[in-house]
């Protein structure tokens, strides 16, 4: 197809012209007309990571009742895991499914039913539209609850709403030097687990926290804790000062205590440091072997009055090819105690952190019969090394890191 750039520009302009709630529908309708498709749909991955919701269908059939489809064993699951297009011939036409992904964050899928076998030009144009759709969804998500609603299988409680808002807007991120993803399986009464990450010019910041209590009390404690950590981090505070301010915030506002782990990795040197505030020790997998990273454990946030000493910043040996797993006690206590986390980490070594983190928390939930007594949270970080300066990108994903085709990177 010629004039690909002009088509992309026209598509973005059309999405910008439409109301935020209609932007995805505009993309779907544009593709339907361009390729005479019988159906074009955008499906968004829900919060569980185990199902998709069909948010837009062109031509529209009226209403916005989302069709929810379990992904396990389906073509949708294959596309999310491999980050590659899927196509098949059906009785109704040629079915094409493309990933809608931004920096490794698997937002959803673009599905088309075409009248004839698509050529390379058509597939390239659809792939380009799917990549553009990722940016369109992210941009318009600031103005509408449509995509948030699509991610939820049921209305959240007040505590759950607070907890969701404390998580990063994207649970997964790919960069040249690292790939990471967090997964949270909430308990029946919500325990306030959170994880967070961000980048500044040359540093990756990661945190995993677990306040005491349940339901709204835990959610409010988590709000104070995460806000204190973010505020300190954004003000340029070092790890020890971030920990001190988080501790002070919980103590000053009477919201009990919380365990946590703060990690900082310098992207240009690979130097890694962390603070452990009464939290479970992390696991590190190196060349297929899993080991516990034993470290000095300081008092939980909020308890400095009983143990008034500074938080210690410790070095962490992190080498290219390592996988680091940070988690909360719900992964190893109660029903989590039935799961051999180290062995499971080995078994999931060929999975992208997105699928690996989900597999780990899902295993704990299954061990509890689907009714967790404590939140189970895992943050999976693959360190590629400071020598890496560029991702190998195809439509928003680093295809070398996809679960089906993960390649060994050499320093």
Please tell me what each predicted stretch does:
Residues 86-102, 108:
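A short, aliphatic-rich beta-strand micro-motif
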Residues 12, 16, 23-84, 277-278:
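Structured interaction and signal-relay segments at domain junctions
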Residues 129-190:
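Regulatory cytosolic signal-relay segments
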Residues 177-191, 243-253, 280-315, 396-411:
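PP2C/PPM family metal-dependent serine/threonine protein phosphatase catalytic domain
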Residues 215-235, 297, 318, 322-371, ...:
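Active-site-proximal, acidic helix/loop segment immediately C-terminal to a metal-coordinating Asp/Glu
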Residues 1-17, 139:
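Signal-transmission linkers at sensory-effector interfaces
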Residues 18, 35-37, 155, 159-168, ...:
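Catalytic core of PPM/PP2C metal-dependent serine/threonine phosphatase domains
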Residues 8, 128, 132, 136, ...:
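Primarily the active-site beta-strand->alpha-helix module of PP2C/PPM metal-dependent phosphatases
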């Amino acid at each position: 197809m010629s004039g690909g750039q002009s088509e992309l520009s026209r598509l973005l302009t059309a999405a910008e012209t439409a109301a935020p709630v209609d932007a995805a529908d505009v993309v779907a309708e544009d593709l339907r007309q361009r390729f005479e498709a019988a159906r074009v749909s955008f499906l968004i991955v829900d919060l569980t990571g185990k199902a998709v919701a069909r948010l837009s269908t062109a031509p529209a059939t009226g209403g916005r009742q989302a069709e929810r489809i379990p992904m396990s064993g389906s073509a949708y699951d294959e596309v999310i895991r491999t980050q590659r297009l899927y196509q098949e011939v059906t009785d109704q036409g040629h079915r094409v499914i493309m990933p809608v992904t931004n920096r490794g964050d698997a937002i959803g899928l673009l599905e088309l039913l075409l009248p004839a076998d698509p050529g390379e030009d058509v597939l390239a144009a659809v792939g380009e539209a799917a990549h553009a759709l990722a940016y369109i969804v992210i941009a318009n998500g600031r103005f509408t609850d449509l995509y948030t609603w699509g991610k939820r299988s049921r209305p959240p409680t007040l505590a759950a709403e607070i907890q969701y808002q404390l998580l990063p807007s994207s649970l997964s991120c790919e960069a040249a030097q690292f790939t990471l993803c967090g997964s949270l399986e909430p308990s029946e009464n919500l325990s306030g687990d959170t994880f967070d990450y961000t980048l500044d010019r040359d540093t990756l910041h990661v945190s995993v926290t677990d306040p005491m209590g349940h339901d709204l009390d835990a959610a409010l404690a988590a709000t104070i804790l995460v806000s204190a950590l973010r505020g300190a981090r954004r003000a340029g505070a070092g790890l020890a000062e971030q920990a001190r301010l988080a501790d002070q915030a919980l103590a000053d506002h009477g919201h009990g205590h919380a365990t946590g782990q703060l990690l900082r990795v310098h992207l240009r040197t690979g130097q890694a440091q962390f603070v452990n505030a009464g939290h479970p020790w992390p696991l590190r997998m190196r060349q297929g072997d899993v080991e516990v990273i034993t470290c000095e454990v300081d008092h939980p946030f909020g308890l400095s009055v009983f143990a008034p000493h500074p938080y210690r910043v410790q070095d962490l040996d992190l080498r290219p090819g390592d996988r680091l797993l940070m988690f909360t006690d719900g992964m190893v206590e109660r029903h989590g105690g039935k799961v051999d986390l180290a062995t499971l980490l080995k078994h999931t070594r060929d999975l992208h952190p997105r699928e690996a983190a989900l597999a780990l928390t899902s295993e704990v939930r299954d061990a509890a019969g689907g009714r967790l007594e404590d939140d189970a949270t895992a943050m999976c970080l693959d360190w590629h090394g400071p020598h890496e300066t560029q991702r190998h990108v195809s439509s928003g994903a680093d295809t070398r890191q996809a679960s089906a085709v993960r390649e060994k990177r050499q320093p």
